Amino acid sequence: MLFSAPLKSNSKKIMLLGSGELGREVAIEAQRLGLEVIAVDRYQNAPAHSVAHRSYVVNMQDKDALLEIIYREKPDYILPEIEAISIDALFEAEDKGYNVIPNANAVSKTMNRKNIRTFAAEVLELKTGAYEFVTTKEMLVSAAGRLGFPCVIKPVMSSSGHGQSVARSASDIDASWEIAKEARGDASELIVEAFVDFDYEITMLTARNGKETVFCEPIGHEQRDGDYVFSWQPMQMSEIAKQRAEDMAKKITDGLGGRGLFGVELFIKGDEVYFSEVSPRPHDTGMVTLITQSQSEFALHLRAVLGLPLEFTFYGEGASAAFKSEVHNFSPVIHVDESLFSKNSFVRIFGKPEAHKGRRLAVALVFDKAEQALQRARELITKVKDS
């Protein structure tokens, strides 16, 4: 493969649509290969903006505004890194010959829970929990009654756990309805899911380069309010369950097609595997790979996009812990205890320009046996504060 220098007439360009902490790591990997990076987001000084050659601030759901930037920059690869973007812009760009990663249809399916659930369950016939779609509170009450309690209620379009809740009884329905309606994204339709009585859930990072598919070791994770707070790798599971998880991950990613890394979320009950969701981009729980693998999920994503070999070394077990802001501040300062910087631990600061309560600002990473690493990560993250 031929490489060139950035900011030249023959440079190879990638455009990140979404410039958060995950996009920032992808941008850094692209810089290491001499690619020219254009980072786009809805707000100024997003994390990837500081490591890109050029950046833009735009309404990410404005089709014409996005297309104007794409046509101006003429990127070789367009990498959607968030869900709240204009899918019409991606389809039009793809029709014009631009390379959308993994492809516009895959992005369209995965950004909408109705599309991906019906595709997975009814087209690919993957095992899932029971579900219904509703558009009114009355329909929600009826669906919850049929599916039983507890049940999980989510907008068909939202990101990072926004708008999700668990209704444990009929008395929770009103609150769940309001939570869903306040979510960023499209809350005009909700998915109601029967609660899967799973033992644990995993992320199966799956990379495709057009010639091969590779899997990272399964990642266990802990969520609060639908958002990741801790992850560890590998998740201990039976060989049968692991093989079934890889088979399911391959089936869904083959069905979506294209190149890149996918975060496939699965529920595990004994040796049984249930499909939950899939993201066609690096996954927040996969930040643990920054310390466990020779090629992180971000490096693998870029390699897959470029069609490069996907071999990597799993260095060993580890864990990650997300730090979420405890205050609101327009110029946040993060206080990190020196104990986080050891021979087997470190911290990554995302450089977000503004903090608000619950916003993810940093991640602590620990290299050790998974159980000990997770315990240490829990301890270390308490030594990070913001003001």
UniProtKB/Swiss-Prot annotation:
Disulfide bonds: none annotated. Keywords: ATP-binding, Ligase, Magnesium, Metal-binding, Nucleotide-binding, Purine biosynthesis. GO terms for molecular function: ATP binding; magnesium ion binding; phosphoribosylglycinamide formyltransferase 2 activity; phosphoribosylglycinamide formyltransferase activity. PROSITE patterns: ATP_GRASP. N(1)-(5-phospho-beta-D-ribosyl)glycinamide binds at E21, L22, E81, D284, K352, R359, R360. Residues 118-306 form the ATP-grasp domain. It comes from the Bacteria. Its EC number is 6.3.1.21. One of its GO terms (cellular component) is cytosol. It catalyses: N(1)-(5-phospho-beta-D-ribosyl)glycinamide + formate + ATP = N(2)-formyl-N(1)-(5-phospho-beta-D-ribosyl)glycinamide + ADP + phosphate + H(+). The keyword Repeat does not apply. The keyword ATP-binding applies. Involved in the de novo purine biosynthesis. Catalyzes the transfer of formate to 5-phospho-ribosyl-glycinamide (GAR), producing 5-phospho-ribosyl-N-formylglycinamide (FGAR). Formate is provided by PurU via hydrolysis of 10-formyl-tetrahydrofolate. NCBIfam families: PRK09288.1, purT. Belongs to the PurK/PurT family. HAMAP family: PurT. This is Formate-dependent phosphoribosylglycinamide formyltransferase. It comes from Sulfurimonas denitrificans (strain ATCC 33889 / DSM 1251).
